[in-house]
């Protein structure tokens, strides 16, 4: 139960019981619950979308996006923005890249990337409602993205002392594969297009390894955001295919 509470606290801003003591090392155990927290996020997002869809797809999309950002506290968006600044300003210098990641200021690369990301999600959420992607797909989608983050932590951490280092090399593989099997079974039944999620996982992991040689907390957050958007795009496209 402690690790579940920590996972909810780490990945969301939802209220949870307060732990009397805390050890940063406990975060490593929380990683087994990432997919479950993703389902919780997805359920809240889909619920608000369902309410808004009674009036208009755009209203549903806006409610879902606002809920998504609020529930997560913009945690993963922050990672995406930091990574965009780092990649844009580092000029392939590892030292410069890490320095930019630690800089609390927001640069132009981050602003542009975050604006495009939010706009893409808003439009794709509207299209998902309009074309009947299905609320179950929206519930499952954040879980797939967060389970991907578990796999990305098999990469070496880029720097010592960050959240990513606490997760690296400390994997509960039985929990990972159980989560994968459950998500795969639900997706095969409710939203088959989401079974392509591991392809997006692999693409992001390959990018991190080839471009950066490892991962950081910002890399994990950015990957979650991009996986969510990628799966939204795939889900919308699937509704327009002849076999959909």
Swiss-Prot record:
The keyword ATP-binding does not apply. Pfam families: CobS (PF02654). It is found in: Cell inner membrane. Keywords: Cell inner membrane, Cell membrane, Cobalamin biosynthesis, Magnesium, Membrane, Transferase, Transmembrane, Transmembrane helix. GO terms for cellular component: plasma membrane. This is Adenosylcobinamide-GDP ribazoletransferase. Belongs to the CobS family. Joins adenosylcobinamide-GDP and alpha-ribazole to generate adenosylcobalamin (Ado-cobalamin). Also synthesizes adenosylcobalamin 5'-phosphate from adenosylcobinamide-GDP and alpha-ribazole 5'-phosphate. It is an enzyme of class 2 (transferase). One of its GO terms (molecular function) is adenosylcobinamide-GDP ribazoletransferase activity. Its cofactor is Mg(2+). Its EC number is 2.7.8.26. Pathway: Cofactor biosynthesis; adenosylcobalamin biosynthesis; adenosylcobalamin from cob(II)yrinate a,c-diamide: step 7/7. The chain crosses the membrane at residues 33-53, 57-77, 109-129, 132-152, 176-196. Its main location: membrane. It is a multi-pass membrane protein. It catalyses: alpha-ribazole + adenosylcob(III)inamide-GDP = adenosylcob(III)alamin + GMP + H(+); alpha-ribazole 5'-phosphate + adenosylcob(III)inamide-GDP = adenosylcob(III)alamin 5'-phosphate + GMP + H(+). GO terms for biological process: cobalamin biosynthetic process.
């Amino acid at each position: 139960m402690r690790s579940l509470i920590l996972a909810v606290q780490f990945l969301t801003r939802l209220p949870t019981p307060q732990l009397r003591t805390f050890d940063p090392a406990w975060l490593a155990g929380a990683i087994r619950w990432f997919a479950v927290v993703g389902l919780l996020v997805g359920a809240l997002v889909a619920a608000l979308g369902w309410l808004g869809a009674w009036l208009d797809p755009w209203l549903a999309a806006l409610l879902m996006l606002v809920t998504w950002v609020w529930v997560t506290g913009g945690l993963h968006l922050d990672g995406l923005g930091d990574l965009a600044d780092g990649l844009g300003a580092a000029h392939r210098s590892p030292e410069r890249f890490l320095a930019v990641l630690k800089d609390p200021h927001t640069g132009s690369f981050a602003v542009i990337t975050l604006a495009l990301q939010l706009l893409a999600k808003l439009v794709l959420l509207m299209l998902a409602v309009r074309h009947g992607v299905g609320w179950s797909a929206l519930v499952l989608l954040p879980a797939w993205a967060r389970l991907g983050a578990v796999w990305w932590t098999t990469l070496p951490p880029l720097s010592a002392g960050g959240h990513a280092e606490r997760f690296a090399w400390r994997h509960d593989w039985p929990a990972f594969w159980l989560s994968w099997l459950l998500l795969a079974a639900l997706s095969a039944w409710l939203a088959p297009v989401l079974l392509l999620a591991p392809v997006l996982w692999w693409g992001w992991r390959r990018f991190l390894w080839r471009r950066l040689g490892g991962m950081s907390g910002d890399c994990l957050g950015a990957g979650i955001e991009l996986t969510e958007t990628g799966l939204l795009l795939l889900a919308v496209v699937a509704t327009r295919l002849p076999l959909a």
